[in-house]
């Protein structure tokens, strides 16, 4: 083989290698761009899917439920209806990410989810870590107890003296139990479904909840009732309101606030009434 032919073949081989590298790079860039586009086209919302009537898990898409990411189950409830309105306004596909309560803030901060719509109150402590929108629901604290039980006719906090009371871990609901004189404050529980089981079995005498959850519990179980206190818990307005949690500096915050402000109080109550009626245990 001549020297010139050898040089020609080496040059051609080098050109082929460079062309292949260029194609690979372009494909990688293309795949990356596609992935980024997909991320921008969805709104990943974190919630427990276990806090009816705000959010729950069900087996089908009835009543507007949305499929849970990575699951054959669906999420429904008041929070899901709010999330659907927000996603529509942002022009994004709603993706529900089922997340334990204590995992919601870490999931938001680590970009696993884009928003928390989970009946979360915008407390000052949480606001140090994440941003909150305008409130999308406001309620009050009540105590769920056994119908016909020792505390069913209670009128004041003092009437619950000696009662075994609990609520959810890392919530204001649990903190306000300290306002009950001589209460037996039980260990906080992970979810309200656990509290319902504990109340039914007599492990506790009651638990502190927001009024919608109390209505939900008593609607689902005729053995439960709830007490609205004449002289109730002393709370900050932020403790009984719920808002959407966002990462600090989220560019969509103003747009989301517009969506929330457009929902009238009457509409909010209608959505909550529908959620209470549609919760799986109420059927």
Show which residues each predicted segment covers:
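Acidic, polar ligand-binding/catalytic clefts
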Residues: 93-159, 235
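Extracytoplasmic small-molecule ligand-binding "clamshell" domains
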Residues: 37-120
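A ligand-binding cleft/hinge motif common to bilobed small-molecule-binding domains
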Residues: 120-128, 176-179, 201, 205-238
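Periplasmic-binding protein-like
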Residues: 138-147, 219-260, 278-283
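Short helix-initiation/N-cap motifs at beta->coil->alpha
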Residues: 78, 96-108, 152, 187-197, ...
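Short, low-complexity, disordered segments immediately C-terminal to signal peptides
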Residues: 22-41
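Extended ligand-binding regions for polar small-molecule ligands
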Residues: 22, 80-89, 162, 171, ...
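C-terminal motif of bacterial Sec signal peptides marking the signal peptidase cleavage site
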Residues: 17-20
């Amino acid at each position: 083989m001549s020297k010139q032919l050898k040089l020609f073949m080496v040059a051609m081989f080098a050109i082929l290698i460079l062309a292949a590298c260029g194609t690979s790079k372009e494909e990688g860039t293309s795949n990356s761009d596609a992935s980024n586009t997909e991320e921008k086209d969805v709104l990943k919302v974190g919630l427990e899917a276990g806090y009816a009537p705000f959010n729950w898990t069900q087996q089908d898409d009835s009543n507007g439920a949305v499929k849970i990411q990575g699951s054959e189950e669906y999420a429904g409830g008041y929070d899901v209806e709010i999330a659907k309105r927000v996603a529509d306004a942002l022009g994004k596909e709603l993706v529900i990410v089922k997340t334990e309560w204590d995992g919601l803030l870490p999931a938001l901060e680590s970009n696993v989810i884009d928003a928390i719509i989970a009946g979360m109150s915008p407390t000052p402590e949480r606001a140090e870590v994440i941003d909150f929108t305008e409130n999308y629901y406001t309620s009050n604290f009540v105590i769920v107890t056994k119908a016909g039980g020792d505390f069913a006719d209670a009128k004041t906090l003092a009437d619950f003296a000696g009662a075994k009371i609990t609520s959810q871990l890392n919530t204001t609901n649990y903190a306000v139990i300290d306002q009950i004189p001589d209460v037996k404050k039980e260990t906080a529980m992970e979810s309200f479904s656990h509290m319902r089981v504990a109340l039914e079995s007599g492990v506790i005498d009651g638990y502190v909840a927001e009024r919608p959850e109390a209505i939900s519990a008593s609607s689902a179980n005729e053995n439960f009732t709830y007490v609205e206190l004449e002289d109730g818990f002393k709370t900050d307005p932020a403790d009984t309101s719920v808002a959407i949690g966002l990462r600090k500096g989220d560019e969509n915050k103003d747009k989301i606030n517009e969506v929330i402000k457009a929902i009238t109080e009457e509409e909010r109550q209608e959505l909550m009434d529908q959620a209470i009626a549609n919760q799986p245990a109420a059927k």
